[in-house]
Amino acid sequence: MANTASAEKRNRQAQKRRARNVQVRTGVKSAVKKLREAIAKGDPATTQAALKSAEKTIGKAASKGVLHRNAASRKISRLAKAAAKPAAAAAK
């Protein structure tokens, strides 16, 4: 329990930030899930659209400080690699 007015305010601010961060993180998870589903279906057009959407969502999360920029970069890189794998297999 906060003892001072400033501690109460910091608690309110932390709760607001946490709610916002949870919302952003949920959006990232949803975008990644949609991309993985598109990859599993094997449709290149859907996969590319989902990849673009996921990259945008992850980039925004990194710019807001919800994800570390290196973690976001790593996540985007791995998703792009996973999205490219079926296309490369189809080209062979």
Curated annotation (Swiss-Prot):
InterPro entries documented for this protein: Ribosomal_bS20, Ribosomal_bS20_sf
One GO term (biological process): translation
GO cellular component: cytosol; small ribosomal subunit
SUPFAM superfamilies: Ribosomal protein S20
Disulfide bonds: none
GO molecular-function term, one example from the UniProt record: small ribosomal subunit rRNA binding
Residues in coiled coil: none
Keywords: Ribonucleoprotein, Ribosomal protein, RNA-binding, rRNA-binding
Region listing for Disordered, in residue ranges: 1-28
Pfam families referenced in this protein's UniProt entry, alphabetically: Ribosomal_S20p (PF01649)
Domain of life: Bacteria
Task performed by this protein: Binds directly to 16S ribosomal RNA.
Family per similarity comment: Belongs to the bacterial ribosomal protein bS20 family.
Official protein name in the record: Small ribosomal subunit protein bS20
Species this chain originates from: Anaeromyxobacter dehalogenans (strain 2CP-C)
